[in-house]
């Protein structure tokens, strides 16, 4: 018990405040950029 692994001490949860704030901004941004670039090639 004297030697602890660093993986057991530092745990990286998936859903953090940083993860939510990044994906709440990045996912709609990439979706709108992809949809806008797709609209450029639509011929009427």
Curated annotation (Swiss-Prot):
TM ranges: 19-35
Binding site for heme: 23
InterPro entries in alphabetical order: PSII_cyt_b559_bsu, PSII_cyt_b559_CS, PSII_cyt_b559_N
Biological role stated in the UniProt entry: This b-type cytochrome is tightly associated with the reaction center of photosystem II (PSII). PSII is a light-driven water:plastoquinone oxidoreductase that uses light energy to abstract electrons from H(2)O, generating O(2) and a proton gradient subsequently used for ATP formation. It consists of a core antenna complex that captures photons, and an electron transfer chain that converts photonic excitation into a charge separation.
HAMAP family in UniProt: PSII_PsbF
Similarity comment: Belongs to the PsbE/PsbF family.
Protein name stated in the entry: Cytochrome b559 subunit beta
Gene: psbF
């Amino acid at each position: 018990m004297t030697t602890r692994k660093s993986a057991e001490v530092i745990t990286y949860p998936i859903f953090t405040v940083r993860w939510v704030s990044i994906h709440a901004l990045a996912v709609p941004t990439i979706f709108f950029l992809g949809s806008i670039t797709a609209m450029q090639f639509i011929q009427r």
